[in-house]
UniProtKB/Swiss-Prot annotation:
PANTHER family: 4,5-DOPA DIOXYGENASE EXTRADIOL-LIKE PROTEIN, 4-HYDROXYPHENYLACETATE CATABOLISM PROTEIN
Enzyme Commission identifier(s): 1.13.11.15
Cofactor (UniProt): Fe cation
Protein name: 3,4-dihydroxyphenylacetate 2,3-dioxygenase
A Pfam match: LigB
Molecular function terms from GO: 3,4-dihydroxyphenylacetate 2,3-dioxygenase activity; ferrous iron binding
Listed pathway(s): Aromatic compound metabolism; 4-hydroxyphenylacetate degradation; pyruvate and succinate semialdehyde from 4-hydroxyphenylacetate: step 2/7
Highest taxon above the source species: Bacteria
NCBIfam families named in the record: HpaD_Fe
Catalysis: reaction(s): 3,4-dihydroxyphenylacetate + O2 = 2-hydroxy-5-carboxymethylmuconate semialdehyde + H(+)
Keywords, alphabetical: Aromatic hydrocarbons catabolism, Dioxygenase, Iron, Oxidoreductase
Length: 276
């Protein structure tokens, strides 16, 4: 019987890559990078063999899609922010078995999920960025699930999360799951882009994000789940926050009562532990 060892809501802010490079932004996202490396450390300590990523940069207009190729390899340049991420190489093993189990389980609840083992279907940066800092040595297999869902209902995303747990139970291994996406996600007007590098676009969003992280730390998931649809709407949650809905679906929704660790306060990077 498989085990879900760790679940986390993480950032994939592209300036993490800039933070590595010489220049004025060197070191600007070290806290976020350190948070990713701490999650990797905990996964290793728990014996995780596969990481599932809910990727809010994988936009889909029909169905839920699971990228579970045998192998992922490529050179990634962001088509929306090529001045942030350019020529980033990646090379990871996939897990077709687990991906297919997820699709099969989701279909049992009428969720239109499709597993793909297609060499030309590449990873998006919601997966590539965290794997850069968590999986440099290819310790973990990778499965990426679309989470920028344009015409999808929260109820289906929640069901998908529930069925992922069932799939993991059938899998002979230990799995971690990452909801890769921002909380509030309103981009600043282009002429003000430089001033927004290290600040929120709106004070309202900052206040809301801080409140949300406080709710998580205090275990107030009933309150958070009740506000989630409006929060995702009013604060422009990344991918409409389907990644977070999937994550909470896995963990029992508003009944989750496990531990929560906050690893990177600036980016609300939280690790939610569930043993089983």
């Amino acid at each position: 019987m498989g085990k879900l060892a760790l679940a986390a809501k993480i950032t994939h802010v592209p300036s993490m890559y800039l933070s590595e490079l010489p220049g004025k932004n060197h070191g600007c996202r070290q806290g976020a990078i350190d948070g990713h490396k701490e999650i990797s450390k905990r996964c290793r300590e728990m014996g995780v063999d596969t990481i599932i990523v809910f990727d809010t940069h994988w936009l889909v207009n029909s169905a839920y899609h699971i990228n579970c190729a045998d192998h992922f390899e490529g050179v990634y340049t962001s088509n929306e922010l090529p001045h942030f991420i350019r020529d980033m190489t990646y090379n990871y093993e996939g897990n077709p078995e687990l991906g297919q189990l997820i699709a099969d389980e989701a279909l049992k609840l009428g969720v239109r999920a499709k597993a793909h083992n297609i060499p030309s279907l590449k990873l998006e940066y919601g997966s590539v960025v965290p794997m850069r800092y968590m999986n440099e040595d290819k310790r973990f297999k990778v499965v990426s699930i679309s989470a920028f869902c344009t015409v999808h209902d929260f109820a289906d995303s929640r069901k998908l999360g529930e069925r992922i747990v069932k799939a993991i139970e059938q899998y002979d291994g230990t799995v971690a799951v990452l909801a890769s996406g921002s909380l509030s996600h309103r981009f600043i007007d282009d002429q003000r882009a430089e001033e927004g590098m290290n600040s929120y676009t709106r004070e309202f969003d900052r206040q809301m994000d801080e409140r949300v992280v406080k709710l998580w730390r205090e275990g107030q998931f009933k309150e958070f789940c009740n506000m989630l649809p409006e929060y995702a709407d009013y604060c422009y949650g990344e991918g409409n926050m389907h990644d977070t809905v999937m994550l909470l679906g896995m963990l029992g929704w508003d009944k989750y009562d496990g531990k929560v660790w906050s690893l990177s306060p600036s980016y609300s990077q939280a690790s939610w532990h569930r043993s089983g």
